[in-house]
Amino acid sequence: MKHTGGSLPMYMQIAEMLVREVAAGRLIDGEKLAPERDMAADLGIAVGTLRKSLAELQERGLLERVQGSGNYIRAVSDPQSVYAFFRLELIEGGGLPTAEVLDVARLAKPADLPAFGTSTEGHRIRRLRRIAGKPAAIEEIWLDGSYVDTITIENMSESLYLYYRTRLNLWISKAEDRIDLGDVPEWAPEVFGQKAGSSVPRVLRLSQAQDGAVAEVSWTWFDHTVARYVSRIR
């Protein structure tokens, strides 16, 4: 079953897109943004929506609004992005991530996964990730079954970690990524640019909860002709 519910509000999507543009260096510290009406027209949104986005950035310390002059970018080390753990960007940098849920099921944990959690079962979540609308990656995520009995697709957010935090009181505080090459799985949708069996970059992630326990393990296969894995050291 495919599902795209749980999208962030439009003003938040724009705010997150701008955060990623700053992180990628496409918007730099001190840069003056275009006038609000021009910027809203370029983004295809209402001026009121843009102003909510800019207010969100100002609250996070990423924007300075100078009366009579305009809006200026202020780069900070922690922009508090809901996508702070999402490491894929377009080859040219940045891009707003979105998620399409392909399947959710509670199953026995596969033997080939690293040991994690206290339950013998986990919630397997398969998703297609797009960046700026381009199919870029597929994910198979396993959340330990002890955190919740059932996951309902309709209640999920495009930001899975935001869903964990707001619905399950689970905070992902740290993550370890291990990158290698792997074959695209058979369940990959046709819209993903690499065929099943093709060798692509693959990321194994072990995600820790606020108590230090590994709560989630995931695999991500990404299309290297669309995206890059980016880790910035500050």
UniProtKB/Swiss-Prot annotation:
SUPFAM superfamilies: Chorismate lyase-like, Winged helix' DNA-binding domain. Residues 36-55 bind DNA. Signal peptide: none annotated. It is found in: Cytoplasm. Induction: Induced during growth on sulfoquinovose. CDD domains: WHTH_GntR (cd07377). PROSITE patterns: HTH_GNTR. The keyword DNA-binding applies. GO terms for molecular function: DNA binding; DNA-binding transcription factor activity. Residues 8-76 form the HTH gntR-type domain. GO terms for biological process: negative regulation of DNA-templated transcription. Transmembrane segments: none annotated. Its main location: cytoplasm. Probably regulates expression of genes involved in the sulfoquinovose monooxygenase (sulfo-SMO) pathway (smoABCDEFGHI). This is HTH-type transcriptional regulator SmoD. It comes from Agrobacterium fabrum (strain C58 / ATCC 33970). The lineage of its organism: Bacteria, Pseudomonadati, Pseudomonadota, Alphaproteobacteria, Hyphomicrobiales. The gene is smoD.
